[in-house]
Regions:
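Noncatalytic carbohydrate-binding groove/subsite architecture in carbohydrate-active enzymes
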Residues: 177-294, 321-327, 348-367, 371
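Cleavable C-terminal sorting propeptides in eukaryotic secreted/cell-surface proteins
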Residues: 499-523
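Secreted/extracellular ectodomain signature
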Residues: 372-499
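Aromatic-lined substrate-binding rim segments of carbohydrate-active enzymes
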Residues: 80-132, 182-205
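Active-site-adjacent substrate/metal-binding segments within catalytic domains
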Residues: 21-117, 151
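Substrate-binding cleft of secreted/luminal carbohydrate-active enzymes
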Residues: 280-350, 438-443
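Active-site groove signature of glycoside hydrolases
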Residues: 147-177, 205
């Protein structure tokens, strides 16, 4: 069935009128509610983003500059949103999940269309090139800036429900150490939302995969320790109900019992097994039925667009029309037939308020310590350190060669201070800095220890440079960190540095990317 923009005019006529005063969603205990009344909110969601492997797009920003991304921002095109919002409405959709947006793009048109249709948005904070890497985890300045920029772009819309700070980052026991870095991101994004005085109902959560070896420990870890560090909601990517399965055989019964006493809302962040086609979505009745709806706050079906993975509800014909697939028809009949009764907010007193016990670190089952977490990225500290380095990497050295140079210098000086270890909870003060800043620190540390000009050469890969004497807050931060970089900074940095010449005091770094792998091999 082909549905064009023109054919949807009757459905979307109201969209061009005044913007709907959509009611923001709030969290109370383990449930979502509309903020202005006592009605519980159940997510009837659809994952809404074309494949990351699609051709790059160029987005024009409000300043008339252009930016190129390796993904298609699903909220930046008024034309496509005008095409798709009516179709989402027919599915009784009240939430979409978007996996990557361009924070420099203008999202007003799409967010208005969605708001007028009563549709909320959960946005992932990462993008295909900027996310926490399970094989080489780090929480550093570039990621912090990416994540906060997405929050800045979306926080002003009343129909922004919240954000995911990660998606299936840890997916085996061997990669669970990465969860420490994701939890640090959750902590810092929650703190950022508060510091910016954004709407208090905006939540930060995580979307996990359904791995039997780690699923319980994952849920416990992100909901243990300090409440300020934990997730506001928990998304579960689950594909265990295939074809005409059942509440018991699919594992839904076990998962429901596991989360019965969880203290924050839980929902399916992705669901819709396609091992049996067409997908008849018989799980919808169970998910929104009386038993599961006591625990789960609905779910997000995967996905709107048909791609090579064959999960689509529609196939795109062009910018104004799509073809409805068989899955669309089956899902529509199921989702439009459910109506969970829900809980009255006024009479609801949460009883499951206790946080989970943190999973112990063992080589066989869990590798992330709950405390301490990686430090909050501090660009001021990194800048102060950078300006006080007398020996730095030469400008002729390609960034692709940083790892090799790092392995050499760390074979000559103690680089323990630059490691980041989610299992032991050992994090360097400069661990959030950029790779060049980290390499500069290591080179300068060795140079300062040797005290001779030849110590800053490395076959032409390093060079001496004029330095800046740290003053004020910069001096205080550098002092707190120490020359070996094992200290920590207290308070907020606002200092600067003044120009002088001479040798520097050193800072401390944690290497990300290729450098991180080198460090783990050396330390």
């Amino acid at each position: 069935m082909k549905l064009t923009l023109a054919a949807a005019v009757a459905v979307t006529t109201f969209i061009g009128r005044a913007v709907a005063d959509i009611d923001p969603i709030v969290i109370k205990g383990s449930k979502f509610f509309y903020s202005s009344n006592n009605t519980q909110f159940y997510i009837r969601g659809v994952a809404y983003q074309q494949d990351y492997t699609a051709n790059s797009t160029t987005t024009t920003t409000s300043s008339s500059s252009t930016t190129s991304t390796s993904y298609i921002d699903p909220l930046s095109s008024k034309t496509t949103c005008e095409r798709d919002v009516p179709i989402l409405q027919k599915l009784n959709t009240n939430t979409i999940r978007v996996y990557a947006i361009d924070p420099t793009a203008n999202h007003d048109d799409c967010m208005t269309l969605l708001a007028n249709a009563g549709i909320y948005v959960i946005a992932d904070l990462s993008d295909p090139t900027e996310s926490i890497n399970r094989d080489d985890p780090r929480w550093e300045i570039a990621l912090y800036n990416r994540y906060t920029s997405v929050i800045d772009a979306m926080a002003g819309y009343k129909n922004t429900l919240g954000f995911f700070a990660g998606n299936e980052v840890s997916n085996t026991v061997d990669t669970t150490d990465a969860s420490a870095f994701v939890k640090a991101a959750v902590r810092d994004m929650k703190s950022y939302i508060s510091s910016k005085n954004y709407r208090s109902g905006l939540g930060v959560g995580y979307a996990t995969n359904d791995d039997k070896e780690i699923r319980v420990a994952m849920a416990d870890y992100f909901n243990c320790g300090e409440e300020a560090d934990g997730i506001d909601f928990w998304g579960y990517n689950i594909y265990s109900w295939c074809g005409d399965s059942s509440y018991k055989d699919s594992g839904y019964q076990d998962r429901t019992e596991e989360f019965r006493n969880y203290s924050v809302p839980v929902f399916f962040a992705e669901y819709g097994c396609n091992e049996v086609t067409p997908r008849k979505f018989t799980e919808v009745e169970a998910l929104y039925g009386d038993v599961m709806s006591e625990v789960w706050s609905g779910g997000i079906v995967y996905m709107y667009f048909q791609e090579d993975n064959d999960y689509g509800l529609v196939s795109v014909i062009d910018s104004t029309s799509v073809s409805l697939l068989a899955d669309y028809t089956y899902y529509s009949s199921r989702i439009n037939a459910v109506s969970p009764s829900g809980t009255n907010k006024a009479s609801y007193t949460p009883t499951n308020t206790a946080l989970q016990s943190c999973p112990p670190v063992t080589s066989a089952s869990w590798l992330a310590t709950a405390s301490p977490l990686p430090p909050t990225p501090n660009s001021a500290l990194c800048s102060c350190m950078e300006q006080t380095n007398a020996c730095v990497v030469d400008s002729s050295v390609s960034s692709s060669d940083y790892a090799d140079l790092f392995s050499v210098v760390c074979g000559l000086t103690d680089c323990t201070g630059v490691s980041a270890n989610g299992t032991t909870g050992s994090y360097g003060a400069y661990g959030m800095c950029q790779p060049k800043q980290q390499l500069d620190w290591a080179l300068n540390k060795y140079y300062s220890e040797q005290g001779v000009a030849s110590a800053c050469d490395f076959s032409g890969s390093a060079t001496t440079t004029s330095t800046v004497e740290a003053t004020g807050s910069c001096s205080s931060m550098i002092s707190q960190v120490g020359t070996d970089g094992t200290g920590s900074v207290t308070g907020t940095a606002t200092g600067s540095a003044t120009s002088t010449t001479g040798t520097s005091g050193a800072g401390r770094v944690v290497a990300g990317g290729a450098l991180g792998g080198v460090l783990r091999a050396l330390l």
